[in-house]
């Protein structure tokens, strides 16, 4: 009896070969599908159904299995990638010596860039072009299935070398050590939590690569990777926009990536690209309505979402700050208007990182506060940028109203009010914050220099509408105050020479160049201006350029996009 059962079992289950064969063609029975077992296809009943004692049924009307989840989306993205790359591939030859990211359009005179400055850029430190080996374009005969996807780039950037987990960890740590103290828009624990996961949505991958881009720029060990990181981040940000759903919600990580890329491009003196990238961030901020996070019409934020909400506040205010700095530098209209903002100022970074964010004040409250409840150098920078933005807006508005023949409010009264507010903020900086010489804090140093640069910017606004000022003696007096502010900037800048270049705020060139241009423009009115200018230029020779540590801030003057800076460079180079 036992031998008969063994023989029967052996007949039902023939011996399998030692090597694994491909799965049998044909349909599995319903019982095997339900139990997720491999069906042997025996008729009239398969082995599993015989052992289970159930009826063996095969559904011949079942629809064939379709592609895996996400396959079609990935395929569409790859097709879009190839379609975008193919036109550029035919231009690799003629464009091998031209980089649109760094070379300005010489026909545009609004930003003061000239042909001579363009030629100096191409000779000084040209950024990588699309024809570099590590970022080579695919062959036109490459199939869609072989196109590189962004999901695999974390393991291999540009085919140069694999990005191991150890390198990723070091780049993340470099970012939080050298970049985050100046650009405090990421919650470290939250970022590292999802950064370790292999499966990420596109916006988070873009942010991760933007983090690595800035980290590698400020690293001697990984600096050779920065161009590949940068190109991959920009390309994927563009692809996610072109191939995605135009009505899909925007992620905070996408805005963070654009802000970091704009900062990187500013540090590399890719001025036009920095402006365009910053503009993307500003529009996405408006699209997400981050200017009304704390609107009374919105429900209270759940406790579980406090960190995420605080991170959104920081993203908004960093975009706001960047918008005002670029507008100050180029005399542009402000994009993010302070008068429609209903988002509280960010909490101090220590409380934010600990997961216990303090509820900040509204901008309109903080700007008039004489005794701040919490101290935050970044908030001081935001307030100072707001004062400069108001001065810029008043000057632009006054000029337009004068052209239209409209009655404009008294310029002197408006300027006096801004000057009183600025004087109050400078007193708060000196009383409630340590001196930059006592502590090595890039944000604190930037806040102190930004405060003095604001005095210069207010004088610059006054000089632009000097015909509207009632009392000429007041203009002379404010010019003297601006000169005193420039003296303080020179003293603070001298302290920066004692720090490593990665301890200096990435946007520090903006207020320093503003000071240099002010001294240069007024050098004929008093010998003190020229003397101070020469001292500042000497400090520029000692300050290392993050774009190229072998060069100094003098090189940034050469790559500047304003007429005053380029005139200063020409005169300085022709001097005996």
From Swiss-Prot:
DNA-binding region: 29-56
SMART domains, alphabetized: Fungal_trans, GAL4
Low complexity: compositionally biased ranges: 114-124
Chain segments carrying region Disordered: 1-27, 102-148
Disrupted-gene phenotype: Leads to a large decrease in the transcription of pksCT and ctnC, together with reduction of citrinin production to barely detectable level.
GO biological process, one term: DNA-templated transcription
Gene Ontology MF, one: DNA-binding transcription factor activity, RNA polymerase II-specific
Keywords, ordered alphabetically: DNA-binding, Metal-binding, Nucleus, Transcription, Transcription regulation, Zinc
Source superkingdom: Eukaryota
UniProt-listed InterPro entries: TF_fung, Transcription_factor_dom_fun, Zn2-C6_fun-type_DNA-bd_sf, Zn2Cys6_DnaBD
Major place of residence: nucleus
Keyword Mitochondrion: no
Compositional bias of kind Polar residues: 137-148
Cellular compartments annotated: Nucleus
SUPFAM superfamilies xrefs: Zn2/Cys6 DNA-binding domain
GO cellular component entries: nucleus
Known role: Transcription factor that regulates the expression of the gene cluster that mediates the biosynthesis of the mycotoxin citrinin, a hepato-nephrotoxic compound to humans due to inhibition of respiration complex III.
Protein name: Citrinin biosynthesis transcriptional activator ctnR
Species assigned in the record: Monascus purpureus
Organism lineage string: Eukaryota, Fungi, Dikarya, Ascomycota, Pezizomycotina
